Amino acid sequence: MAMTLLEDWCRGMDVNSQRALLVWGIPVNCDEAEIEETLQAAMPQVSYRMLGRMFWREENAKAALLELTGAVDYAAIPREMPGKGGVWKVLFKPPTSDAEFLERLHLFLAREGWTVQDVARVLGFQNPTPTPGPEMPAEMLNYILDNVIQPLVESIWYKRLTLFSGRDIPGPGEETFDPWLEHTNEVLEEWQVSDVEKRRRLMESLRGPAADVIRILKSNNPAITTAECLKALEQVFGSVESSRDAQIKFLNTYQNPGEKLSAYVIRLEPLLQKVVEKGAIDKDNVNQARLEQVIAGANHSGAIRRQLWLTGAGEGPAPNLFQLLVQIREEEAKEEEEEAEATLLQLGLEGHF
């Protein structure tokens, strides 16, 4: 998701995505000066300019796009940085060296029993030169770059899935089903390829019984989709939980001591969606069910809980997940400001100023 945002944003601003950084997790109330101060403290040796900021609805936070303006040491760019409101995340696409690219390209073609000359001949170019270089006709070179090299790059370089076999005791490097499925769903959103290619990459991650299940399904239905494969794996290897069990787990999940209410809501959401999938809660009632459980499960006795209770007691519809998080985070920000003011006042009374 983040990589898609980085690439689309760069495309819209005509910026090379390999010369850009995406920083997100920035609080909504953080202004440009605060963002710049945090960036400069975390990346003092990195030369950049800020191209823009936006509100990222899925993260309920701001994101910033930076363009790298000088020579870049990618090792000096942190993946995370401490900032206002917590940890800010950083994403970038470091360029691959020409030597590594050519090596992987030739290995890929060799596995398929092809050479660059074979590719050129199939594309209709007569008497191709032995190696791609400056003497290659511009028409041929451009065509190969656009129609062969770029698709090959997307096939050779992509984020791999973790391994899953479905065995009772996972082997080295293998995951149990639930963590594997969560990671797989995240990566599938990042891949900008056809469903056939997604299915091929999915098969790469499967071993043992899990691979056997998909091979059998594919032999019976060659057009089976990636989503159908994942659904089948979930039915075979996922946890068996009744609708009643899922509902009890949801209703008995409470806010932990020291946990922010917004974090509790996010932690509660997968449990709620599981209850909805099991049919214990109707989709039309999901917002009301979420609000009621947040009020019941919160151990916070301050203004936030009172505000939520008033929201639930009102005649209007219950807020959706995004609206609820915005409401809670606004109240959390107010409480943090009040606590900071109270601390400063106390320090003043004690003569620390």
Swiss-Prot record:
Stated name of the protein: Paraneoplastic antigen Ma1
Primary location: nucleus
Signal peptide: none
Keywords: Nucleus, Tumor antigen
GO biological process, one term: positive regulation of apoptotic process
Tissue: Testis- and brain-specific. In some cancer patients, specifically expressed by paraneoplastic tumor cells.
Entry-linked PANTHER family: PARANEOPLASTIC ANTIGEN, PARANEOPLASTIC ANTIGEN MA1
InterPro entries, A to Z: PNMA, PNMA_C, PNMA_N
Further comment: Antibodies against PNMA1 are present in sera from patients suffering of paraneoplastic neurological disorders.
Family designation: Belongs to the PNMA family.
Origin superkingdom: Eukaryota
Membrane spanning residue stretches: none
Any one Gene Ontology cellular component term annotated for this protein: cytoplasm
Subcellular location: Nucleus, Nucleolus
